Amino acid sequence: MTEYILLLVGTVLVNNFVLVKFLGLCPFMGVSKKLETAIGMGLATTFVLTLASVCAYLVESYVLRPLGIEYLRTMSFILVIAVVVQFTEMVVHKTSPTLYRLLGIFLPLITTNCAVLGVALLNINENHNFIESIIYGFGAAVGFSLVLILFASMRERIAAADVPVPFRGASIAMITAGLMSLAFMGFTGLVK
């Protein structure tokens, strides 16, 4: 049980996929201008990342390895992620049309979010079992959502602040992301 908690804390805080592994930077910068959009994207990505990790583990364990076709891993994982994202898009469209409109193009772009494919591939490379795959995918998703929501709330506050002209826009966003990354580095010694 302790190793599961350490895996969860490690993926959320210590080895955050956005701030440490630099995966998922496109939605991190693109969807983080408004807090409500960031929350919606975080929830959708949490669902997709967790489900894609589970599906990728199952495809790897019960299709690719038994047939000896591990070289098709990346292509099969992209197909799995595309199916999971389409399912998520249908669910969001039915349950929350407002959120569906707010997320716009970013919802189908979860398919090309490198964090989703990265988590699936790292899951397999680290030889996680089924439970660890679920925890790893969920922890990565919670870490992504946490960083996205924190960054969106900071960007909203910065938008209301008097920022010097040369630092407005992407410049101050990159500086803020760098400072967030430094703050998350404080968790480095928490989990080995």
UniProtKB/Swiss-Prot annotation:
Its EC number is 7.-.-.-. It holds the Pfam family Rnf-Nqr. It is an enzyme of class 7 (translocase). It is found in: Cell inner membrane. The keyword Cell membrane applies. The chain crosses the membrane at residues 5-25, 39-59, 67-87, 102-122, 134-154, 171-191. Signal peptide: none annotated. It is a multi-pass membrane protein. The keyword Coiled coil does not apply. Its main location: membrane. Keywords: Cell inner membrane, Cell membrane, Electron transport, Membrane, Translocase, Transmembrane, Transmembrane helix, Transport. GO terms for cellular component: plasma membrane. Part of a membrane-bound complex that couples electron transfer with translocation of ions across the membrane. The complex is composed of six subunits: RnfA, RnfB, RnfC, RnfD, RnfE and RnfG. Belongs to the NqrDE/RnfAE family. NCBIfam families: PRK05151.1, rnfA. This is Ion-translocating oxidoreductase complex subunit A.
